[in-house]
C-alpha cells in the first residue's frame, strides 16, 4: 500500500505570497499527489515562501533553514525548497550558506516546481531557477479551487515604479499583466464553485493592461466592470495600488459598479513632499488628496486606508508633522505603518539612516495612536447603521454564532442560520468593540436586489481555447 506523500509550506509576507503558496499546493497535488500538512516533521517536501520587505528578512530565512536542517539530518530524502522574494534576491547564495536546500525558485518560476522536484529526486543535485519568464507561470497552474466564499486572484506581477525603498522590481520583475480572458476564466471557475467575493491582486493593480482575445488591451477599470458582470461575484476588492496611476477612469467605476467595495487601500508612505521625492513616489501630498476628493465625490461613503514608512532617511520632525497633518486631512481608516529599515540593493540603502531608533519608535507610536483613534471613530459611527456582510463561517469566539465582514473589513458577529454561510446578509450594528462589531440580521440574500448579468458557465464557455498546435479560437 502506497503511503501518502506530504507537503509543508511556510509562507511569509503579502497576499501575493499567500496566493502563490496556494497555487504551489494545488500544483504539486495535481502532478505528484502531495497532500498539505500542518506538521513539518511529517512532510516529504518543505517549501519556504519568503518575503524581503521586513527587516532582517535574510537572517529570518537562514534561522528557519537551520531548524529544517535538523529534520533533513534524520531524513536525508527530505526535499527543501526556498521560494519567494528572498530567493529571487539571494539566489545561489542561499545554497552557499544552507547546503541543506535542494531547490531555489523565484515568484515567477513556481510553476516549474514539479520538474525541479523530479530533477532533485533523479540526480540529488540542487536546482536554482530565479528567472523572470514573463507571465508563463499562470499558463502552467491547475484550475483554481474555492476555499470559502472569498478568493484571491492574481491579475499581474511586478512593478515598474522603482520606489527607492522597495525591492519588488528586483525580486518580482517589472509589470506583466495576465490576459484579460485568463483572469475572467479563473474568476468564473471560482464563481461556479460558490465564491462571492474576489480580491484582485498585484503589486500595482491599477497599471493592469491585459491583452484581450482580439488583440486589444483591457484596462483595469474595464476589467473591474467585466468581473462585476459575472453572476455570483457581488463583491470586488483589489490590492495594491499606486497613486500616480489611480486615474479618473478607475474612479468612475466607483460611480457605476456597486460590486466594487466602498473601501480602498491606497499607500501614500509620507505626507512630506520632500520625503516623497526622496522615495521617488512621483506625486505630492496635494495630488494624493486630490485623488481622495474625487473618490469621495464618486462614492461618498468610501473609507481609505494606507501605508506609512516612519523614519525614512532624512525625515525631520517637520516632515513627520506633515505626515500627521495628511492623516488628519484625509481621516484615514485602519492603516499599516512601519519603521524604515534599509533593504539591500535598493537606492535608499545608500542614504544615511540618520533618524535614531528611539525617534522612529516615538513617531510610530504617535502615528499609530492617531490612526487607531480615527479607525475607532469610524467603527463607532457604524452603530445603528445597516451593513451588508459576507458570511464567512462560525464566529471564533462562539461557535453558535456566525461571522462575516463588512465592505470596510470590520468583523461582525451575529446570530444566524448555518445556511447563511457563503451568502450575504444585511445586519444592523448593535454593538461596537475594539476589534469587532455585533449585528442583528434584518435582511437575507433572497430579499436583496443583486445584479444578474452573465452566468459563470457562459464566461467559461466563451473563453479562448487552443488546439494541439496552439491555434487559438474564441467563442463569443
UniProtKB/Swiss-Prot annotation:
Residue ranges annotated for the Radical SAM core domain, each copy included: 145-377
Record's GO cellular component terms: cytosol
Domain TRAM residue range list: 380-443
InterPro entries associated with the record: Elp3/MiaA/NifB-like_rSAM (IPR006638), Methylthiotransferase (IPR005839), Methylthiotransferase_CS (IPR020612), Methylthiotransferase_N (IPR013848), Methylthiotransferase_N_sf (IPR038135), MiaB_methiolase (IPR006463), rSAM (IPR007197), rSAM_horseshoe (IPR023404)
Swiss-Prot/TrEMBL catalytic activity: N(6)-dimethylallyladenosine(37) in tRNA + (sulfur carrier)-SH + AH2 + 2 S-adenosyl-L-methionine = 2-methylsulfanyl-N(6)-dimethylallyladenosine(37) in tRNA + (sulfur carrier)-H + 5'-deoxyadenosine + L-methionine + A + S-adenosyl-L-homocysteine + 2 H(+)
Family: Belongs to the methylthiotransferase family. MiaB subfamily.
Functional summary from the UniProt entry: Catalyzes the methylthiolation of N6-(dimethylallyl)adenosine (i(6)A), leading to the formation of 2-methylthio-N6-(dimethylallyl)adenosine (ms(2)i(6)A) at position 37 in tRNAs that read codons beginning with uridine.
PANTHER family with a match to the protein in the record: CDK5 REGULATORY SUBUNIT-ASSOCIATED PROTEIN 1, MITOCHONDRIAL TRNA METHYLTHIOTRANSFERASE CDK5RAP1
Name of this chain's protein: tRNA-2-methylthio-N(6)-dimethylallyladenosine synthase
Organism: Photorhabdus laumondii subsp. laumondii (strain DSM 15139 / CIP 105565 / TT01)
Amino acid at each position: 500500500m502506497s503511503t501518502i506523500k506530504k507537503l509543508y509550506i511556510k509562507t511569509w509576507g503579502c497576499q501575493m505570497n499567500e496566493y502563490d503558496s496556494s497555487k504551489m499546493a494545488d500544483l504539486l497535488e495535481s502532478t505528484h499527489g502531495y497532500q498539505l500538512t500542518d506538521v513539518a516533521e511529517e512532510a516529504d517536501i518543505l517549501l519556504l515562501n519568503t518575503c524581503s520587505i521586513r527587516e532582517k528578512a535574510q537572517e529570518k530565512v537562514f534561522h528557519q533553514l537551520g531548524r529544517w536542517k535538523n529534520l533533513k539530518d534524520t531524513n536525508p530524502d527530505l526535499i527543501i525548497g526556498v521560494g519567494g522574494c528572498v530567493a529571487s534576491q539571494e539566489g545561489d547564495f542561499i545554497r552557499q550558506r544552507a547546503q541543506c536546500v535542494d531547490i531555489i525558485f523565484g515568484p515567477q518560476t513556481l510553476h516549474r516546481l514539479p520538474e525541479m522536484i523530479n530533477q532533485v529526486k533523479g540526480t540529488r543535485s540542487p536546482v536554482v531557477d530565479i528567472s523572470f519568464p514573463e507571465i508563463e507561470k499562470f499558463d502552467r497552474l491547475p484550475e483554481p479551487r474555492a476555499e470559502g466564499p472569498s478568493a484571491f486572484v492574481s491579475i499581474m506581477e511586478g512593478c515598474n515604479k522603482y520606489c527607492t525603498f522597495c525591492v519588488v522590481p528586483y525580486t518580482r520583475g517589472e509589470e506583466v499583466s495576465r490576459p484579460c480572458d485568463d483572469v475572467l476564466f479563473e474568476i468564473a471557475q471560482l464563481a461556479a464553485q460558490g465564491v462571492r467575493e474576489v480580491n484582485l491582486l498585484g503589486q500595482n493593480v491599477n497599471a493592469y493592461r491585459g491583452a484581450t482575445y482580439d488583440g486589444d488591451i483591457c484596462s483595469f477599470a474595464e476589467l473591474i466592470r467585466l468581473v462585476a458582470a459575472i453572476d455570483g461575484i457581488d463583491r470586488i476588492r483589489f490590492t495594491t495600488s499606486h497613486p500616480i496611476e489611480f486615474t479618473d477612469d478607475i474612479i468612475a467605476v466607483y460611480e457605476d459598479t456597486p460590486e466594487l467595495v466602498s473601501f480602498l487601500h491606497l499607500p501614500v508612505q509620507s505626507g512630506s513632499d520632500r520625503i516623497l521625492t526622496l522615495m521617488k513616489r512621483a506625486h505630492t501630498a496635494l495630488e494624493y488628496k486630490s485623488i481622495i476628493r474625487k473618490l469621495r465625490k464618486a462614492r461618498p461613503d468610501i473609507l481609505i486606508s494606507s501605508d506609512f514608512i516612519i523614519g525614512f532617511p532624512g525625515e525631520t520632525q517637520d516632515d513627520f508633522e506633515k505626515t500627521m497633518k495628511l492623516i488628519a486631512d484625509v481621516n484615514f481608516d485602519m492603516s499599516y505603518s512601519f519603521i524604515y529599515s534599509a533593504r539591500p540593493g535598493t537606492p535608499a540603502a545608500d542614504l544615511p539612516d540618520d533618524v535614531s531608533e528611539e525617534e522612529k519608535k516615538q513617531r510610530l507610536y504617535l502615528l499609530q495612536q492617531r490612526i487607531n483613534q480615527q479607525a475607532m471613530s469610524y467603527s463607532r459611527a457604524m452603530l445603528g447603521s445597516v451593513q451588508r456582510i459576507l458570511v464567512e463561517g462560525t464566529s471564533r469566539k462562539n461557535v453558535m454564532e456566525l461571522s462575516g465582514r463588512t465592505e470596510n473589513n470590520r468583523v461582525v458577529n451575529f446570530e444566524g442560520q448555518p445556511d447563511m454561510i457563503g451568502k450575504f446578509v444585511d445586519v444592523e450594528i448593535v454593538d461596537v468593540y475594539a476589534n469587532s462589531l455585533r449585528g442583528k440580521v434584518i435582511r437575507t440574500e433572497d430579499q436583496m436586489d443583486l445584479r444578474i448579468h452573465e452566468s459563470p458557465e457562459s464566461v467559461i464557455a466563451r473563453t479562448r481555447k487552443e488546439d494541439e498546435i496552439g491555434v487559438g479560437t474564441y467563442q463569443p
